């Protein structure tokens, strides 16, 4: 076992968790498990779901708890969280969204503008987390391109199989390497392959000879798996 993904964090604020998902564990438990994994030398990531009706202060509290734990682990010369990924709660045609609409004290949902603002704030606030990932499976390629301009430097992976976002009713849960490279290139960046530790790998030019890739020269490297 090499790593432990950071899914399940959602919102590390107890009042929000109790209202939205009372059967899930306390936020402290998520942080404890991730810290144990980090102390064992496993590669870990941190996640955040917004749009539960939480306040801006709740969102900052989530970021603060991640940053504080990252500070503790970095003092031990360990990498801690290699990346941070946020996305809005998915309320499309799934039973979760239908069942809870109007049933909670929180009004749910977060649009593209709110998401992009959160990406930008995350990049500024989490100064000790090296990489911010854009969430194209939940936001689509167009918004993911804008997220790269808002502070994200990682486009994630092609995801040959995905069972969480797809179950929520969204339709875009896989992409070819050509699609990812093209989106990154059109946003003005250079696509670069990586592994889960963010070591850069040889990157074949999936756009070679493609007229669709004719645009401005790339400005900065963007990671992709």
Feature names for model-found ranges:
Residues 1-42, 49-73, 99-110, 170-171:
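Conserved non-cysteine loop/helix-boundary elements of the Radical SAM core domain that shape
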Residues 2-3, 43, 82, 153:
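Short acidic/polar active-site loop segments enriched in Thr and Asp
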Residues 5, 45-47, 154-158:
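Short hydrophobic alpha-helical runs that function as membrane-insertion/retention elements
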Residues 8, 44-50, 83-88, 136:
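A cross-domain feature marking catalytic cores of carbohydrate-active enzymes
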Residues 63, 71-225:
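Auxiliary Fe-S-binding modules of radical SAM enzymes
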């Amino acid at each position: 076992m090499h790593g432990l993904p950071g899914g399940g964090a959602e919102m590390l604020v107890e009042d929000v968790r109790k209202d939205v998902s009372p059967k899930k564990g306390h936020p402290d438990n998520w942080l404890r498990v991730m810290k144990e994994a980090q102390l064992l030398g496993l590669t870990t990531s941190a996640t955040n779901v917004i749009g539960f009706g939480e306040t801006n202060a709740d969102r900052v509290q989530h970021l603060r708890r991640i940053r504080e734990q990252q500070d503790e682990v970095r003092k031990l010369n360990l990498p801690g969280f290699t990346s941070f990924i946020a996305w809005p709660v998915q309320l499309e045609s799934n039973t979760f969204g239908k069942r809870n609409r109007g049933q909670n004290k929180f009004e749910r949902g977060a649009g593209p503008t709110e998401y992009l603002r959160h990406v930008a704030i995350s990049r500024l606030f989490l100064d000790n987390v090296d990489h911010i990932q854009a969430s194209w499976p939940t936001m689509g390629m167009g918004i993911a391109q804008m997220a790269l301009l808002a502070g994200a430097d990682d486009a994630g992976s092609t995801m040959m199989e995905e069972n969480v976002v797809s179950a929520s009713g969204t339709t875009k849960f896989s992409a070819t390497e050509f699609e990812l490279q093209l989106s990154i290139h059109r946003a003005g960046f250079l696509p670069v392959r990586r592994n889960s530790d963010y070591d850069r790998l040889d990157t074949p030019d999936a756009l070679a000879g493609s007229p669709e890739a004719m645009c401005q020269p790339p400005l900065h490297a963007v990671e992709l798996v």
